[in-house]
Amino acid sequence: MIVIFIFILIAVGLLSTKILHRYISIKKIPWYVYISVWIGWFMCFSIVILVPIDILCTDYRQCKHISDSQSEKLNEIITNISNGTNSGSNNNNNNNNEIINKYDSCEEPWAYISNDKLEYIYQTFYFGTLLLTWLVYPLMGSFVLAGDFHLSGRITRSIKENAYLYLIFGVIGLVVMIWLLAVKQLDWNSMVGFAMAAANTWGLCLVIILMGYGLVETPRSIWVSSQRSLVLKHLQFKAVELLNSKKKANEELIATMKVIRRIQEKTKKYDPYEKYIKIIVDQCPPEQYALVQRGEGDGEATYSVLVALNSRLKNAITNSQRAEFLYDQCLVEAFELQDIQNSAISLDKNVNWSFREQRQGRFAKKLDIMEWIWYNYLEISVFRVAAIVFAVLSLLIIWSEFALAFTSFDISVLSNIVKHSNVSNIFVQFILFFPLGYEALTCYSTLFKIRIFNYYRLIPHQHSDSNSIIFSAAYLCRLGAPLCYNFIQFINMNSGIEDNRTSFSVVMGTMNVAPFLGTYFYIYFPLLIVIVCLSTLFNVYSRIMNCLNISKFRFDVDFSHEQIDEGKFLIDSERRKWTQNNIKPLSSKSPPPSLDSTSNNPKQIFKSGSTTISKQSPPNLNVSGGNINNNNTNNGNTSSARSFIDSFLKKSSNNNNNNNNNNNPYEQTLLFDESNDFDDDDDIESGGAGRPTYNAHLSSSFNGGANSTSISGYPQINKMFGGANRYSQLPKK
């Protein structure tokens, strides 16, 4: 059995590595961040995997205990049966058979682990996650963000930044400890239990909120994914926002490099800060920094100024890289979705991908046909069936949470399955794995989509920064134990009977040591998940935002908006330029190296397929009928259309601001929802009558003028069409 247990841990380690590899690369972030995050993820996932095994082992030990306690009675019954004394009683025979069957059913589970070993493993993983969450990850996050040029300086700064927080916690902990010793007269073990109860209470609050959102959003997002026209419309709307975000990030990077240029110009040779300035300059993207001819600022260089500037540059490069990838990924998703829609009328039964390599080999044709069948006949049905299955699982979990309040009788479906089924049945073992696995999926997937002021955000294809992955690991560790404790609660495996308590419950201890929390808190607080689910189902968050004049558009198949038309034009234009210039998406390239403040190697973050625009001979553009055509594609000085459009838009925007003298009666600003939004993209709403919808966020003020109709991403482009403008002014909110 120990071999199976080791195999399970190896599988958990591989799973942790696979998921972690989706978001970060060892080449991109410091090695110590990668290892510490991997350890935290591994211990958290291991706790989730071990709990179902723990439940099976506990049920097996309980069965053996009952069988052993009745062994004498069983022997007497067997003797009576052999002598024929009870042959006339059918009821007694039925009872005898039931007892014998119960005895025979106590078979050892396929992954049985002794109670002592499980408790030791739980203690190691649980207290390891506590250490990482409350000590290692906060210090490491501050260390990674520090702009100091020496190791000692970065360590000192990270300790100082966290010292205030630890001081507050220390004072509160000291007061509580004195109160527990003086008033409650608790011993050391009880105080440790109190600390665990406080930590688990905070974790349980997070679990209820995140899981409540995920239980509704997971099946709904899968159902919405089957409506391709709606998804494409949302991508068109989102492309404009991402283009604006990309421009802002690039402008911040250029502004930072201008400050660096000014300091470099004023720094003389053999200056004591020259080596630090060289480190900062070497981190700037070479091609972009070469275009910065004149600096800005006072140019005064002190150590504190250079430290702050180094940190600012690292953040600017990270944000620019992130914005570039998100915009690129949005375009790729739109291109692929258009290719799938066009393949429906394909006579050769093949999906003609615009930006994918064609398959090669003897089975290439068959694989292409199978792929075409999947996208045109199977995918939509599979998505809808999966959405229905997940919706049923969500209802099962919500009912189990609701059943916790009924302590006098057991109405939990999962609890009754565990109690009245044979533990050796492999089907029952999988029944235990699936609900907890689905809980972890809904909770963790919501955590991975969280973005706090666009600062902590996990980006797939290894484009996440170190601080975001540390933040996710810290909260992942906080959620593991409370999630499992809640699962054990609603299957009634946490009673006070020693033989009926799981090893996990023994390690976690009782929660009665916290008087203002107590057992009732863990029974009735999960009922709030019903409120969270209903709020998510009926889009209460969106309605609150609308009341605050932060418009959230409800996307359905009939929804139309000027920004969707603009995004459609943008995506079509980018498709032509990608095709002409043979541009490949960022997701197909390896991520850039890490931004280490102590390194002197230049860092390049932009696509290798892009080249710079020649100022002497920029590409010629013909604008007619809403199309932009590049007539200089064969010129050696021609760059990618994306780089030219960005520079063209920036120049046009500056001209527009100068011509209007900043007297425009409106102000246009397209924003991301930078609140604690759960979704990596935009929230999904329900449009009523069974029609799912998307949310998109648009600020309430818009910019326009008498001589120009400005649209986000293309401030002056409508002036070139002559005649009536294609896009009308958006109404002021």
Swiss-Prot record:
Keywords of the record: Coiled coil, Membrane, Transmembrane, Transmembrane helix
Biased segments, Polar residues type: 596-619
Gene Ontology CC terms: membrane
Coiled-coil segments on the chain, per record: 232-266
Residue stretches spanning the membrane: 1-21, 33-53, 125-145, 163-183, 191-211, 386-406, 423-443, 468-488, 513-533
Record keyword Coiled coil present: yes
Region feature Disordered, mapped onto this chain: 581-641, 649-668, 674-696
Disulfide bonds: none
Chief location: membrane
One Pfam match: LMBR1
Keyword Transmembrane helix tagged: yes
Topology term for the membrane: Multi-pass membrane protein
Biased composition (Acidic residues): 674-685
Subcellular location: Membrane
Similarity section: Belongs to the LIMR family.
Protein name: LMBR1 domain-containing protein 2 homolog A
Source organism per UniProt: Dictyostelium discoideum (Social amoeba)
